[in-house]
From Swiss-Prot:
Tissue: Accumulates in root nodules after inoculation by bacteria of the genus Rhizobium.
GO molecular function, one term: metal ion binding
The family this protein is said to belong to: Belongs to the plant globin family.
Record PTM Nitrated tyrosine, positions in chain: 24, 29, 134
Gene Ontology biological-process annotations: nodulation; response to abscisic acid
Annotated SUPFAM superfamilies: Globin-like
Name of protein: Leghemoglobin 49
Modification Phosphoserine occurs at: 44
Biological source species: Vicia faba (Broad bean)
Post-translational modification: Nitrated in effective nodules and particularly in hypoxic conditions; this mechanism may play a protective role in the symbiosis by buffering toxic peroxynitrite NO(2)(-). Nitration level decrease during nodule senescence.
Amino acid sequence: MGFTQQQEALVNSSWESFKQNPSYSVLFYTIILEKAPAAKGMFSFLKDSAGVVDSPKLQAHAEQVFGMVRDSAIQLQATGEVVLKNGSLGAIHIQKGVVDPHFVVVKEALLKTIKEASGDKWSEELSIAWEVAYDGLATAIKKAMS
């Protein structure tokens, strides 16, 4: 069964909740660094800081990550596959030293952040929708890395 309109709607509505509060971007990177402290150096806006500090670059990158997952949901619903809009995304991930376990860490951080942003609207269906959309994006990035 393909990605449904309902799943796309769930991702879209929770994406809006995420965007409304900049503290969710800080939470996202805090979770990543709790799970993979060595990943700090992969992010230019974090590598010289003592911890996760809110900044315009951090906000922009978090919105870009979550936005790409949202775009993946739209693509999955429309065509059943994710095609990267940024052709250099694979090369960027290779340059930063991203490997498979990093995708797992980011997925976990993304889901925990969306759970927090969604509050009482969080559900198993919402989690699955974000998981499937993220997995589609991760697969497309990994393909671009090979």
